[in-house]
Amino acid sequence: MRIALYSNSPLPVHGYGGTQRVVVWLARGLVELGHQVTVLAPAGSRLREAHVIGLDLEAIRRPDFNVSRYLPEGIDILHAHARLPSPPAHPFVFTLHGNRQDGTAASNTIFLSADHARRHGSTTFVYNGVDPSEYIFRSPKDGYDLFLGRLHSVKGYRWAIHGARRSGKTLVVAGGWRPSWRRSLRYEGSVDGTRKAELLAGADCLWMPALWEEPFGLTLVEAMMSGTPVLGTRRGALPEVVSPDGGLL
């Protein structure tokens, strides 16, 4: 098939950016299966795996943006990973990577988990996947707990700080900004690539005390790929993604 993928963020991502990584991995996997893949993303995006059509960022943000103008001839289907102001003239599906406030979505929307789909009145979902080659599975650990992701209140990072302190562990925080610190915390900032894989492989556990309905939680899979158990809450997709032998909710 001739498949087009659409992202409204530059590719590849540097630092935090789960959705962008999923798009790159999906392009890579589809090419390996023998499909012809074209990626539409902001100008400056580069992918070894697929042909990239660079889009003007200002054009993407306009309410009259029409992605059909940029699609090459012969495309069989468009898979959008960001909302489009108007439906394209080609067959397309849309993966919702967040939550809609009204809890509804179009019939051709793909959700990230059964819980995510149910909360939007659907039963159609596909779990996110990861590229195993980007992770390090390691059994001997380095004696610290890890919090990885956006330092936002809905991510529950304060509970991770409290839990690690109660257990006498050092908590490594890898996120986008630095809150007030205590001596039991170590701040890594935003990480990706090899450093992220090393932190995941070396952690005794990954904290994910989500206080919102996580659509999926890519970090959960990344931790389990690294042999690192998860400590989290029973919110959103966490009970689906974290197996009984993969962590504790």
Pin down the residues of each PLM region.
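Short acidic/histidine- and often glycine-rich active-site loop of Leloir-type glycosyltransferases
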Residues: 181, 234-249
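A short hydrophobic beta-strand element within the catalytic core of glycosyltransferases
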Residues: 206-207
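Short hydrophobic beta-strand element within catalytic cores of glycosyltransferases
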Residues: 229-232
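Short alpha-helical segment that forms part of, or immediately flanks, the ligand-binding pocket
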Residues: 197, 220-225, 239-240
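N-terminal strand-loop element at the rim of the active site
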Residues: 9-13, 29-62
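Conserved active-site histidine-acidic residue motif and adjacent donor-binding/catalytic loop
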Residues: 177-179, 185-202, 211-213, 236
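Conserved donor-binding/catalytic core segment of Leloir-type glycosyltransferases
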Residues: 123-174
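Donor nucleotide-sugar binding/catalytic pocket of nucleotide-sugar-dependent glycosyltransferases
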Residues: 94-136
